[in-house]
């Protein structure tokens, strides 16, 4: 997992509340267990007019030319609700998104995102609405997110503070998923195992 320090990127809006995991990555695409290749199926039922995924829906935000290459998604409350599926952050990341900004997230999705290097940022509803208005008003609008400073900077330069658990922040800054975090304590684990009495092994 790559460390996340800060990121500035083109922002895209999905102005909907309760975007659930079945909308993010529909169940028919969950047969793979590797993380790659899910981006093409992201928001499948919204992005495409046909089941095969051959005909793009020109009215869907992510398909509009001005948002091509977007790496920051701004949405409404309770993003990532619904069934638990790690494929949801996989699909968002594989599409090229680095940050999701919303007033609130479903708890399981929030944790899965952090564990997969995707930064979920909670901001106040008014701050999210301001970001959406600024992004909508100017083509090519970029947002900056600084995990070290815990700030989000809007296209106009307004700065908002966000909070994240210190453990999650540490793992993202250092590029540590659950396995990486365990391996970072390899010497301590080995020392503990070496000192276990033989009768306990």
Swiss-Prot record:
Pfam families: Aconitase_C
UniProt protein name: 3-isopropylmalate dehydratase small subunit
GO terms for MF: 3-isopropylmalate dehydratase activity
Coiled coil: none
Listed GO CC annotations: 3-isopropylmalate dehydratase complex
Listed NCBIfam families: leuD (TIGR00171), PRK01641.1 (NF002458)
Chain's gene name: leuD
Enzyme class label: lyase
Family: Belongs to the LeuD family. LeuD type 1 subfamily.
GO biological process annotation, one example: L-leucine biosynthetic process
Description of how the protein assembles with itself and partners: Heterodimer of LeuC and LeuD.
General function of this protein: Catalyzes the isomerization between 2-isopropylmalate and 3-isopropylmalate, via the formation of 2-isopropylmaleate.
SUPFAM superfamilies on file: LeuD/IlvD-like
Domain of life: Bacteria
Reaction equation(s) it catalyzes: (2R,3S)-3-isopropylmalate = (2S)-2-isopropylmalate
InterPro entries, A to Z: 3-IsopropMal_deHydase_ssu, Aconitase/3IPM_dehydase_swvl, AconitaseA/IPMdHydase_ssu_swvl, IPMI_Swivel, LeuD
Sorted UniProt keywords: Amino-acid biosynthesis, Branched-chain amino acid biosynthesis, Leucine biosynthesis, Lyase
Pathway linked to the protein: Amino-acid biosynthesis; L-leucine biosynthesis; L-leucine from 3-methyl-2-oxobutanoate: step 2/4
Protein source organism: Shewanella pealeana (strain ATCC 700345 / ANG-SQ1)
